[in-house]
Amino acid sequence: MKCGNGIEARQVNELFINVDPIQAGGRLTGDAIKAIIAYGDGYSVCDNCRKPNRLDCIAKPPIAEFHKDVAAWLNMDAARMMPGARRGFQAVAHTYVSKGNPVLLTSLSHYTEFLAVEGAGGVACEIPADSNHLVTPDAAAAKIEEVKQKFGKAPVLAIIDHVDYQYGNLHDFAGIAKVAHQYDVPVLYNGAYTVGTMPVDGKVIGADFIVGSGHKSMASPAPSGVLATTAERAKEVFRTTGITGDVTGRKFGIKEPELMGCTLMGATLVGMMASFPHVKERVKHFDKELVNNRIVMEALLSIEGTKILSEYPRKHTLTRVDTTGSFDRVAETHKKKGFYFSSALNDKGIFGLIPGATRIWKFNTYGMTEKQTRYLADAFVAVAQENGLPVK
């Protein structure tokens, strides 16, 4: 089936159990799909844009109400929807970071955090993770002291992942934020893998800013995300324009420079809005997600030579696995080499592993039913047994 000239209709989620680590939390709800069709035209949400002529103030569809609801849901004071989490990082970095300023990141930070700092002219200063791939408050304190010695001042900003993309480990964000605040360092909470999948309370964790990814964890179309702030920081990041044309004398009302005037628009925004009631409900049941994930973990660990590189027991559904001692042993002599593994799983209706990967790889069980996770667990064991690997 085609949906355009040379464009094959994508049917991955209809035909397979999808374990792709970055796709699990972004699968659309039925309501979001309907919203995309209804609001697919470019400026569709602007039908009723009136003074003050800013998108987040539109009442129909209820965009203004949605922004207030998201801020309240995260227990923050203000929020704007962004074209992806990376644009949230960018807005905050551009506001607080100047050329040569030190910015606190971690050794597990996503590349988009580095690029946001680079774009603002800052210097990346990484808190090293420990041997368990965890970033700790003590390590944060030591790094801040190191930065003070080197730069003569504390970092101007800290960007800290609650759950990192490499291991899916849950870091002590609240503890790190407490340390950073002792040095008057504002802290950005990177919730790309948490906002929309598990409960997040900005006041409790001590975040000055919360960034979430709509297309990664809020069942939303891409590119979409959220930037939420405290009231104090909202005045700075969501400041309004002050520029005036020297010939025309034109001014631009209450447009916000860090959003290039307006918040996220069109089908992406309304898709987020349509999924939001479902997202608010599902974060209440994250414990069930961990129960389902455990089923797969136990199956993988029953295959001799398999190791879980992420913290264990798991506190998140994104997991990094080392099968150098199991599935990669088969790849050494298999006629398909490492491609046999993803091929065998595809034949069993499982999609999302990088083709050819049999050593270290990641997967995500978020959103699966218990029946699906049991099927996935059995599939891993079956592939092992079919290829002569010992199973406990």
Curated annotation (Swiss-Prot):
EC number: 2.5.1.73
Cofactors, names only: pyridoxal 5'-phosphate
Modified residues (N6-(pyridoxal phosphate)lysine): K216
GO biological process: translation
Matches recorded under InterPro entries: Aminotrans_V_dom (IPR000192), PyrdxlP-dep_Trfase (IPR015424), PyrdxlP-dep_Trfase_major (IPR015421), PyrdxlP-dep_Trfase_small (IPR015422), Sep_Cys-tRNA_synth_arc (IPR013375)
Cleavable signal peptide: none
Enzyme superclass (EC): transferase
Catalytic activity: O-phospho-L-seryl-tRNA(Cys) + hydrogen sulfide + H(+) = L-cysteinyl-tRNA(Cys) + phosphate
Binding residues annotated for pyridoxal 5'-phosphate, in chain numbering: A85, R86, N190, S213, G214, H215
Assembly with partners or alone: Homodimer. Interacts with SepRS.
Name of the featured protein: O-phospho-L-seryl-tRNA:Cys-tRNA synthase 1
Source organism of the structure: Methanoregula boonei (strain DSM 21154 / JCM 14090 / 6A8)
